[in-house]
């Protein structure tokens, strides 16, 4: 019997990740570079068979899964990034101005 394996892949670049802004529930699209990143990874994954592919329901993640060749990946709300609340969209330095111990 084969050992189970878990493969993890982060979504491609977004405008906010490019700028160092924290993103949780804001549903951002991939940048052109993010699309290219996913396409490059797809080449490495070509021919790999997975029993199950899961993705966050957010577009940046589900679009990445589709570009990787898994358009039918199951969307799981539990895989969405944590909620940054009032810090959504801010950079770490901007957050630390408001909350120095953050």
Task: Identify the role of each PLM range.
Residues 68-102:
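Phosphate-handling substructures
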Residues 1-3, 76:
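Solvent-exposed, charged interface segments at domain starts and junctions
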Residues 3-4, 9-71, 98:
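Active-site-proximal alpha-helix that buttresses catalytic centers in soluble enzyme cores
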């Amino acid at each position: 019997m084969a050992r189970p394996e878990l493969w993890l892949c982060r979504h491609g670049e977004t405008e906010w990740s490019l700028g160092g802004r924290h993103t949780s529930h804001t549903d951002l699209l991939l940048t052109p570079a993010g699309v290219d990143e996913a396409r490059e990874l797809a080449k490495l994954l070509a021919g790999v068979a997975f029993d199950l592919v899961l993705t966050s329901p957010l577009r940046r993640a589900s679009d990445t899964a589709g570009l990787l060749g898994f358009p039918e990946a199951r969307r799981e709300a539990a895989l969405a990034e944590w909620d940054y609340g009032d810090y959504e969209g801010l950079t770490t330095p901007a957050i630390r101005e408001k909350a120095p111990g953050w």
